[in-house]
Amino acid sequence: MVYPILIFTLPLLLGFLMDRVLGDPMRLGHPIVFFGSLIGFGEKHLNNGASRRLKGFLYNGSLVCFTFFLPLLTFAFLLIGAAINYYLGDLYFGHFLLLAIALPSTICIFYMLSGKTLVTEVKGVFSALSVSLEAGRKQVGRIVGRDTGSLSAQEIRTAALETLAENLSDGVVGPMLSWSFFGTPGILTYKMINTQDSMVGYLNERYRAYGFFSAKLDDLVNLIPSRTTAILMLIAAGRLDLLRKTFQHGKRHLSPNSGYPEAALALVLSCRFGGPHDYFGEVVDKPYIGEVGRELSDEDLQRAVQITQRTEWLALGLSLLLRLLLILLIIWYL
């Protein structure tokens, strides 16, 4: 009883710890790069002519289904094999088959989480700004999807902290919650959807039709993670008294999800996010989130990183608890 429970919970803990220590192993190759290649191939060959929305739905929807069902069927085969061997009394081979599920799951979780890399990149923005404004613009351009060539120092710091809050949900909390309920197929599919949205889920002329499905699906799968992230951030900061304001300000964002973690961080730091954003020639006026329009400093970065790292640990604990409850429920039902 204990061994199967450990096999189906420990991968999350180990994968999380590996991410905290090692960060993204880009030199070894990364599944997200492969996801991006598949998405880019479809966009290049299908995002033209008529019926773009339909073509985007069929191609990107197929990628989502493939990403979920291929590992699901593989792990189901291994799990059935383990169950048969346990039934026949061959415990050693049964244990081996469960390990064949757990080890790839651990590696997959490690690759899908981006907590350390996110913090490193945001710190790099503030460090680059201390060198020059141009260096700060170049560095922040690595983590935001808009034109950074005309940003002021304050706008660069704001963009970095906005990204820190938003990607805490997309890159850490969301993947862990997905794994706690749906295992490795869930976390892979979540990141496929998230990558599609980051590549083709824009409202400009080029992507509005083709990326419609990807954008809406990303909105759907992030409804719970984004709000959970905001709540965990407030707990991490010891500011649950800001919960109502966080949800009020979070609703102002043009995205149905991004505003909640951003609002939590802005209110805790007593600063303000939002305002005009230049998306490569197209200016988008985002509603202001937060109450105090002031200059951001290195102290704000330190506080934001502290909240982020505490939130990651809280999300880990929550995800492990949910996973354990799900396993116990399945065992009880069977």
Place the predicted regions along the sequence by residue.
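Hydrophobic alpha-helical transmembrane segments
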Residues: 1-188, 193, 201-334
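RNA/tRNA-interacting regions in translation and RNA-turnover enzymes
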Residues: 198
